[in-house]
Amino acid sequence: MSRPQRLTSSSPWDCSGGVFDWDAALRKLDELNARVEDPTLWDRPSEAQAVSRDRASLAARVGAVQELEGGLKDALEYAELADMEGDEALLEDARAQLKDLKDRAGRAELEALLSGEADGNDCYVEINSGAGGTESCDWAGMLLRMYSRWANAHKMSVELVEETAGDQVGIKSATLLVKGANAYGWLKTEAGVHRLVRISPYDAAAKRHTSFASAWVYPVVDDTIEIDINPSDVRTDTYRASGAGGQHINKTDSAVRLTHIPTGIAVACQAGRSQHQNREEAWKMLRARLYEAELQRREAAQQALEDQKTDIGWGHQIRSYVLQPYQMVKDLRTNVETSDTQGVLDGDLDAFMGASLAQRVGATRDA
């Protein structure tokens, strides 16, 4: 594979800050290409998969820079031609192209920050309602929809692997499996407690209510990562899957819950049609949870995973969503805020995720 041509225009990243060093990236890509072409590497399948994954990730980032710079060159030439001809319609097209390039460059810059060990992995998003009955269950259901919409907007696949319905509306808990490039890297910034303030549609007196729900995010563990679990440390429970019913409702005890006794970590799966399918997926979820706990222990700048999981209430919020008496979504970690509450609930989360990601990287560098 030939070495990519050195770019002549400035990179969209601040290379001096160490976010994306172009020369170092090309040298690393050369090294990874050479390793992949070494036939002896494939005698070690796990290592070969890891190297191939790293090469694909870096090649995508290098390609993104080249694609953006090529697009910028074309758009500027297009704008210059439109200006020479005095064609306002062509100029408007050129402006739209430049805006699109700016948006893509901004996202690519943020993705360059996704350098954590598991950032490129798929992930599970676990949502739980807090105290508050109907209101909190409804709010948890709104979060489930919000994250599903965000993932779909970014061409990621979403699978509901577990859901416990609320007594009247919404959900008590649910787990999503999100598959896509850097799914964990992006969604890990959403872990924490989310607070909703609104006039309740379920209160005949139309009083304002405050509700809480939590989101916790765990990376999917692929075959190149070894997580040792002693089967005797895991308790298995089976139960009947819950849901809306219908012709596909499972009338056997096909749902599976696994509890890791030493840590108390529990996972459940009921999406499969058989107990075997649910057991297999539950084991994947348990490995993800234990891997995330290990990652947290390695990060001195963050608390351990189980230390984060305190009461879902006032003192542990990451974001506040106020729908009445005014409209405002504010991230309490970064102070990023917007009055477009509906846009946020429809999955427009990039500004919040980007600011939180940049803050995390900054804290790590300052540590």
Swiss-Prot record:
Post-translational modification: Methylated by PrmC. Methylation increases the termination efficiency of RF2.
GO CC term, one of those recorded: cytoplasm
Positions in coiled-coil regions: none
Location in or out of the cell: Cytoplasm
Chief location of this protein within or outside the cell: cytoplasm
Signal peptide bounds: none
GO MF terms, alphabetically ordered: translation release factor activity, codon specific
Residue positions where N5-methylglutamine is found in the record: Q247
Keywords, sorted A to Z: Cytoplasm, Methylation, Protein biosynthesis
Function: Peptide chain release factor 2 directs the termination of translation in response to the peptide chain termination codons UGA and UAA.
HAMAP family cross-referenced by the UniProt entry: Rel_fac_2
Family that this chain belongs to: Belongs to the prokaryotic/mitochondrial release factor family.
Name of protein: Peptide chain release factor 2
Species of provenance: Caulobacter sp. (strain K31)
Gene that specifies this protein: prfB
